[in-house]
Amino acid sequence: MSIALAFFILVLLGFSWASPSALDDTFNVSRSVGLISSSNLESCQSSPLEVGNIYNSTSASEILSTLDAKYITIIGVIGSSNSSIQDLIDSVGNSNNAASSNPTSTVTEYVDRVQTVTEYVTLSCGQAFTSTVDISSSTSSSVINSPTGTAVSSQISTLSMSPSSTPVFSPSASVSSKVASSVSYVSSEPSDSSSSTNTVILTTSVNSPAVSSSETLTSVSITSTESAYTSSSVDIAASTTASSTLPVSTSEATVSFSTDIPATPSTLSSPASSSSSYLVETSSTLTDSVFTTVTATSDSSVITYTLINSVTSSSETTNLPSSSSSLVTIGESSFPSSLLSLLTQSFSTVRSTSSSSTDQLTSASPISSSVISPSVSSPTSSILTNSGSIKSGDHQIVTTSFVQTTTHGSQVETLTYVTTLTETILTTTYDSHTFLTTITPSPSNSISYTNNTFIPSSSIKSSIVYSVTPTSAENYTSSEAFSTSSSLVVIPPVNSSLVTSSTSFTKFSSLSSSQLSTENFTSASSSLSLTNAKSSLSTPSTTIPTSNSSVSLQTSSSLIISSPIISSSLTATSTSTPALTHSITPSNTSYTSSLIPSSSTDYSSSLITVCSNVTSEISSTSLASLISTLTSQQISSNKSSEFVGQTTTEYTTSGSVGFTTTLATQSGSVPGTVLVDVPTPSWITETVTSGSVGFTTTIATPIGTTAGTVLVDIPTPSWVTETVTSGSIGFTTTIATPIGSTAGTVLVDVPTPSWVTETVTSGSVGFTTTIATPIGSTAGTVLVDIPTPSWVTETVTSGSVGFTTTIATPVGTTAGTVLVDIPTPSWVTETVTSGSVGFTTTIATPVGTTAGTVVVDVPTPSWVTETVTSGSVGFTTTIATPIGSTAGTVLVDIPTPSWVTETVTSGSVGFTTTIATPVGTTAGTVLVDIPTPSWVTETVTSGSVGFTTTIATPIGTTAGTVLVDIPTPSWVTETVTSGSVGFTTTIATPVGTTAGTVLVDIPTPSWVTETVTSGSVGFTTTIATPIGTTAGTVLVDIPQQHATTTTTTTFDGFSGYTSSYTGSITETIVIGTPHHSVVDVS
C-alpha cells in the first residue's frame, strides 16, 4: 500500500513599507515531519486516503473562504488519488473566489507575493493539520481536520482540537517571526491504540517599534481516550497549571491560555540582582525538540543557574560565585559564568521568558577545520574566513568571503560575496535498519570571475542528479545535488523507512514558477502531467509500470539564474529495491529520468518544482519528507532577515530591476558589513563611517539613476537619521546623529560631481549645518541635523530664481549664523552686528540685481525692524532697533555705487536718521528709525524736481536738526537761531533760484508765523516771530507755479504699498508713516 502525503503551500505575497512601524525583517521557518509506522499503515489500507476530503467539509470550506483568493497559489502536490487533486483545486478556488469562472487560474495567479504561509499536511486515515501565520496582522491560526470533516480553528491564544478521533501523530511545526506569534507542536506517539497525548508549546512573541512585549510560553497537554478528553495547560514562565476534562461526545474542546506581554528592553544582558529566564531549544532525540528553561539568579556573591526540562520536568542547579570566571558544569556541558555566553555558545535557539529581551539568538555550529581555497579564477584580493574544529556528529559550517575591489579614478569600490556551506553527517537506527544521511555542499562553480568581472551563474554549466542504486535486496542508496539554487525533485518509492537529518542552507535565488511550463512523466501505459504556468494542474495517473520510463521538462527559452550556486547532496539507505536515475543539464531543455526496477512493486511518484529564496531550518524523519520539506518549505520574500550563526543579515531590494543589498551585522557589535550581491556595473555603493564608535552607513545607488537607497545598519535606539529629498530629480541626503550628541554627520548619496555640499559649524557647541546644491542649479536645500528644540532656523527665498538663505540660531542665544547655499559669485551678503548684545542682521543680494532680502535672525521680542522700499527699481532699506533702546542701525542692502546714504546722529541720546538716495537721482527717502512718540519729524517737498527736506526733533526739545538729502551743489540751506531759548529756523533754497522754503521745526505755540501771498503770480512771503517778541524775520521762498506730487512706498517685508499725493502750490501734503513691519523668526 502506498503512502499518501500532501503538502500544499498557500502563499500570500506583498510587503508594505509605508511607515516606520513596518514589518520586522526576520522570518524563520522550521518544521519536522514524523513518519507513519507500518502498523498504522495497515489500519488505513481498507480506506484509501482522499486528499479532497480535507476541503469537501462545510466547516473547512468556511475556513478557506476567509483567505483572500488573490493571494493563494499551489506550488506542489504529492498524492495517490487521481481525482482528489482536481477536487482540491476546485474547492480552494470556489472557497476563495465564488465569482471566478476558472478556479485553477485563481489559485495559481499570484505566486510572487508572500505574506501568509499556510501548510497542509495529510496524516494517516485522512487527518489534516493546518498552521497559518499572517505576518501583516501578527496572528496565527491552527486547524486539525478529522476524517469526518470536522474542522476547528484557533487564534494565537486558543488551541482547538476534535476529541472524536485520536491522531496517530502530529507534525512538529514551528513558524517564528519577531512580529508574528509562534506556535510549536511537540508530539509523542501513544503507548497504545486507545489513548493519545499531544503536548503543545505555544509561544507568543511580538517585537515591533510600536509594541513592547516579551515571550510567554505555555505548555498544553491534550489527552484523548475512549471515554474522556483531558486538557491541561502549564504556563512555563508563571509556573501555573490549568486543566479540564470533557466527554467524548463533546464536538469541540478548547484549551485557552493567557499571554503576558511585559515591557521590552533593547538588548540581552547578564543577570543582575533579579532573576532572568531564557528558553533554549535542544534535541534530546533526532526527532523531538526539547525546550529547556535556563534561569540565572544572582546577588552580590552567587550566581545560580537552573535548567528545567519542559518534557521530563527534571531540573539541575549549579551555584557559582559571581566573581568567578571559570566554567559552570551542568549535566555534561560546561558553561561560562556569563548567562549570555552560556546561551549563545551552548544552545541553537535562545528565547527570553522574562522582561530582559525578546530577541532570538542562534548560535553558530562548530566550524570545519578544512580549508576551502578560492577558485583559480577568483580575484587576487580574496579573503577566506571562519575556520575551526569539527564536532563529532554535528554540523560543520564553512563560510567563504570573496572580496572584489575595483578602482575608478580616486574612488575605490569593494564588492563582497559570502557563501555559507553546511555539512551534516547523521546515523539513525530504526528497528533493525540503519540509515545514513549525509548532506555535503560544494562551493565549486559558485562564483566565476574573468578579469575581475562577475559572470552570472546562468552561464555556468551545472547539473542536478538524483540517483537510486540498489545496494542489496533490502536497501538502496539515494543522493541528490542541489544546484542553480532551484530543485527538481522526484520522490523515490519509500514504503517504510526513517531518515533523520537537520541542516541549514541558503538559496540566494531561483527560477520563478512563471518560467516553468510543463513537466511530464511518460510511459507505455500511463502519464503524469504537472503544469505550473498559470494554467492547470492535473494528475491523470500516478502509477508507473515496471518498465523503463522517461521524463521530459519543457521550460521557457531563458533561465534566469543570476546568483552564486550552493550545491549539496543527500545520501540515505532504505528498504526499497527499485533504482531511479534523474538528471538535469541546464545547457539544454532536455531532461530524462529512467526507472530500473528490481521487482514488480507498484509505487506512487510525483514531480515537484519549487522556486524561491529563503533560509530554512529543516528537521525531517523520512527521506520523502526531507526532500519534500527542502522543496516545499521555501518562501519568497522581498525583504527578509535570518540568523546565520551569530550574524544578523538584512536584505533590501531597490528599484524596478530588483537589485538587492545585504547588510550583515555580527551579534554584539554595532557596525555591520555591507554585502552587495549585484555586480559592480549595476550597483554603486558608498560607505561612510561616522564618529569615534565607528557607526557605518551605506548608500546604494542603481546604475543609471541619480537617487539611491540609504541603508543604515545601526538600530534606531543608537542612531538617529533624517533624510531630505531635494529638487525634482530626487537627490537624497541623510544626516546621521549618534544618540547623546548634538552634531551629526551628513551622508550624501550622490557623487561629488553631481551634488555640491557646504558645511558650516556654528557656536562653541559645534552644531553643524550642511547645504546641498545640485550641480547646474543655484539653489540648494539646507539640511540641519539638530532637532527643533536645539536649533532655530529661518529660510528666505529671494527673487525669481529662487535663491535661498537660511539662518540658524542655537536656542538660548540671540545671534545666529547665516548659512548661504549659493557660491559667492552668485550671492552677495553683508552682515551687520548691532549693539552690545551682538544682534546680527544679514542682507543677501543676488548677483546681477540691486535689491536684496534682509534676513534677521533675532525673535520679535528682541529686535524691532522697519523696512522701506524706494523708487521704481525696488531698492530696499531696513532699520533694526534692539528692544529697550531708541537708536537703531540702518542696514542698506545696495552697494555704495548704487545707493548713496547719509546718516546724521542728533542729540545726546544718539538718535539716528538716514537718508537714502538712489544713484542718478537728486531726491532720496528719509528713513527714521524711531517711532513717532520719540521723534517728531516734518518733511516738505519743494520745487518741480521733488527735492525733499526733513527736520527731526527729539521729543522734549524745542530745536531740531534739519536733514537735507541733496548735496550742497543742489540745495542751499541757511539756518537761523532766534531768541534765548534757541529756536531754530532753516531756509532751503534750490540752486539756481533766489527763493527758498521756510522750514519751521517748532510747533505753532512756540513760533508765530504769518504768510502773505502777493501779486498775480502767487508768490508767498512768510514772517516768523518768536513767542515773546514783537519783531520777526521775513523768510521769502516763492517757487515757480508748479504742482507738487509726493509718492510714498511702504514695504512690510513681503509686499510694497505705494500712495501718491498731488496738490497745488498752497496745499499741505501729509506723508504717512510707513507700515511698521516685524520679522518674526520662528
UniProtKB/Swiss-Prot annotation:
Repeat (Sequence) residue spans along the chain: 646-681, 682-717, 718-753, 754-789, 790-825, 826-861, 862-897, 898-933, 934-969, 970-1005, 1006-1041
Alphabetized InterPro entries for the sequence: S_pombe_Mam3/Map4 (IPR051905)
Position of the signal peptide: 1-18
Organism domain of life: Eukaryota
S-S pairs: none
Gene Ontology CC terms: cytoplasm; external side of fungal-type cell wall
Gene Ontology process terms (BP): conjugation with cellular fusion; flocculation
Region Disordered: start-end pairs: 353-374
Signal among keywords: yes
Region annotated 11 X 36 AA approximate tandem repeats, chain positions: 720-1043
Locations listed in the record: Cell surface
Keyword field: Conjugation, Glycoprotein, Repeat, Signal
Glycosylation sites: N28, N56, N82, N451, N475, N495, N520, N548, N588, N613, N638
Similarity comment: family membership: Belongs to the mam3/map4 family.
Classification via PANTHER family: M CELL-TYPE AGGLUTINATION PROTEIN MAM3-RELATED
Function: M cell-type specific protein involved in agglutination during conjugation.
Name assigned to this protein: M cell-type agglutination protein mam3
